[in-house]
A protein has these predicted regions:
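Short strand-turn-strand beta-turns centered on an Asx-Gly dipeptide
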Residues: 256-261
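Sec-dependent signal peptide cleavage junction
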Residues: 21-56
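Short, aromatic/His-centered strand-loop micro-motif at the edge of beta-sheets
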Residues: 207-243
């Protein structure tokens, strides 16, 4: 026959066992929650690292709005440009936004100006052969460039309009023989294409001959060419992402916005431009010298084909 004392002992034993089992279960649950939290944090970190722009920089150099030891614009060529994200000099002007999966090109007025311009840039220059500016292409050889772009931020002028910037270019270049023929000190030739982000719209400008009967030698001089009237696409992109394509072939240049609007250039001016070599440019060639002005341009994708 059980006594009250024995029942009490039995109760305490059962209670003790239940308490320990419950403590173990709580500990297991806490450990599971802790493991899940760690896993989620790892996934978030992994996800952030994975948002990379679709841009191969191995055939581009960049010019930044900061000067080097010689007082000239600071440039980074391949292969060093591949480490732009950790380059302390580049970081304020060309940096990775891993949340958006884009490279941001940041430009503002500084003393860092290239020859033949008053404006500054954080801009890529195509190098078909890495580290070499002397290998370029002609219209007859053909070329294609595509970019996925967005204006991230821009200052405004006194009238309330956003400052404009050039986001893509095709720049002409004299061969060494052409340079020597006309006695020019460098290989610079005019840009046949400038694509602007202009107060939320995309504006295109090209070159036209002042005299369509000029000789081949006369064509090599920059003053043989004039700016055209320019063209605005109907779509307003504002600060939204958009896609630009540039297709070049013999005597023809086509610019496409978002796969729906086209601007085609062909005829005598394009045909005679065939005398020049060319290279692509892309980024943020900022078109203001106003104090405090700036712009930031995102590139999610940039590809070139020849």
């Amino acid at each position: 026959m059980y006594t009250l004392k024995s029942y009490t002992g039995l109760f305490l034993l059962v209670f003790s066992i239940c308490f320990h089992l419950n403590a173990q279960n709580n500990s297991a649950v806490e450990q599971t929650l802790l493991d899940q939290t760690k896993t989620q944090k790892k996934k978030k970190k992994k996800k952030r690292k994975g948002r990379q722009p679709k841009i191969d920089l191995s055939h581009w150099k960049v010019t930044l709005p900061v000067t080097n030891d010689q007082g000239k614009p600071y440039e980074i060529e391949p292969p060093e440009i591949l480490d732009y994200a950790t380059n302390e000099i580049a970081k304020p002007y060309m940096y990775l936004d891993d949340r958006k999966g884009a490279i941001v090109f940041h430009s503002m007025p500084t003393a860092s100006k290239t020859a033949n311009t008053k404006y500054t840039r954080s801009e890529l220059r195509e190098q078909m052969v890495p580290g070499d500016n002397n290998t370029n292409w002609t219209f007859e050889e053909g070329a294609y460039m595509k970019g996925r772009i967005a204006m991230e931020a821009s200052s405004k002028d006194d009238s309330g309009k956003y400052h404009r910037t050039i986001i893509m270019q095709i720049h002409g270049r004299l061969t060494n023989e052409q340079r020597d023929l006309i006695g020019q000190k460098d290989n610079n030739a005019p840009p046949i294409l400038k694509i602007y982000w202009d107060n939320g719209k995309i504006r295109v400008k090209t070159k036209v001959l002042k005299n369509i009967n000029a000789s081949d030698e006369e064509l090599l001089h920059e003053d043989a060419w004039d700016n055209d009237a320019g063209f605005n696409f109907e779509q307003k992109v504002d600060f939204n992402a958009f896609t630009l394509e540039v297709k070049v072939s013999k005597g023809k240049m086509v610019i496409i916005l978002n796969g729906t609007e086209y601007k085609v250039y062909k005829g005598i001016h394009m045909e005679r431009w065939g005398i020049f070599e060319n290279y692509f440019k892309a980024g943020n060639y900022f078109q203001s010298r106003e104090e405090g002005s700036f712009s930031k341009v995102r590139f999610y994708q940039l590809e070139v084909k020849h």
